[in-house]
Amino acid sequence: MIKQSLCSLCVAVLLVSSSGCKDDIIGDGGSPSNIVFPVSDVSYSIHVQPLFNQTCALGGCHDDGTPDRVKLTSHSNVLFANPQVVVEGSPDQSILVLRIEGRLGQNMPLNRNPLNQNQINGIRAWIAEGARNN
């Protein structure tokens, strides 16, 4: 009886620990501190997409293989997402900003360390600058 209970407990722990995104993108679960945004002239290819790759797009959360979720794997996926998550020129109207700031629904990235203030400001600046594909 004790062995069966212990086995059931182990299975339950495995199931709970495997729920959510399929990979721990940042090995230690930490924030991607190696990505630093400038105050202005934010580059999608140098700053935004690498941040998405480390925190959102490639962990089974917002990648191309995950159905029914916003995909953050390319500029066109981000801009033409359904629902619309980026309103070019309007960070305060962008669901993406509201989610990473924790002002709408669950804070993103889900079950990971939040983005640091520089990264949040960088995403805001990128959107304010027109969410360019640069």
Residues covered by each model-derived region:
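Solvent-exposed helix-loop boundary motif
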Residues: 22-41, 45-124, 133-134
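Bacterial N-terminal signal peptides that target proteins for export
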Residues: 1-9
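C-terminal motif of bacterial Sec signal peptides marking the signal peptidase cleavage site
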Residues: 16-20
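Gram-negative bacterial Sec-dependent N-terminal signal peptides
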Residues: 9-15
